[in-house]
Amino acid sequence: MSAHCQVTGRQPSFGKSVSHSHRRTSRRWNPNVQRRKFFVPSMGRTITLTVSTKGLKVIDRDGIEAVVAQIRARGEKI
């Protein structure tokens, strides 16, 4: 499972870890993504989305129907 939110588009960010002696090594920060199932009444079925915690708040605010319409408008298959 890739660390990519289907709602917000959030992806891993990259940077450096800095030790006490100031050695810099590459690292990445993964978003908190979860696989969640949502029932979509207009489709009459359950869909599984990979969403970040911010994406869950967006679904709570806008509703699953609006979010599914946005995802389909981007051309993603659900």
Curated annotation (Swiss-Prot):
Keywords: Ribonucleoprotein, Ribosomal protein. InterPro entries: Ribosomal_bL28 (IPR026569), Ribosomal_bL28/bL31-like_sf (IPR034704), Ribosomal_bL28_bact-type (IPR001383), Ribosomal_bL28_sf (IPR037147). The keyword Manganese does not apply. It comes from the Bacteria. Residues 1-29 are annotated as: Disordered. The keyword Mitochondrion does not apply. Pfam families: Ribosomal_L28. GO terms for biological process: translation. One of its GO terms (cellular component) is ribosome. One of its GO terms (molecular function) is structural constituent of ribosome. Belongs to the bacterial ribosomal protein bL28 family. This is Large ribosomal subunit protein bL28. It comes from Corynebacterium efficiens (strain DSM 44549 / YS-314 / AJ 12310 / JCM 11189 / NBRC 100395).
